[in-house]
Swiss-Prot record:
Keywords: Ribonucleoprotein, Ribosomal protein. GO terms for molecular function: structural constituent of ribosome. Pfam families: Ribosomal_L27 (PF01016). It comes from the Bacteria. Belongs to the bacterial ribosomal protein bL27 family. InterPro entries: Ribosomal_bL27 (IPR001684), Ribosomal_bL27_CS (IPR018261). The gene is rpmA. Residues 1-22 are annotated as: Disordered. This is Large ribosomal subunit protein bL27. GO terms for cellular component: cytosolic large ribosomal subunit. PROSITE patterns: RIBOSOMAL_L27. Gene3D superfamilies: 2.40.50.100. SUPFAM superfamilies: Ribosomal L27 protein-like. It comes from Mycoplasmopsis pulmonis (strain UAB CTIP). Transmembrane segments: none annotated.
Amino acid sequence: MAKTKAGGSTRNGRDSKGRRLGAKLGDGQFALAGSIIYRQRGTKIFPGQNVGRGNDDTLFMLVDGYVKYEKRRNRKYASVYQEKK
């Protein structure tokens, strides 16, 4: 005799892996050109000074320098400056 009744099957129990989005460099952090600043879907943060935007909306540094997150006209920007601001 079985200790418990037959369990049956379920159609749940799956989940997708996390996409590792978000900030990769913090405000005031120094990094080299080509470094990824922010991974995102859509333009949650816009590219500012010395920052490029990839096909998947990833923000990356165009020059060596310090990352600065700024807010202008109800938009968030990520900029890179060669001197710390």
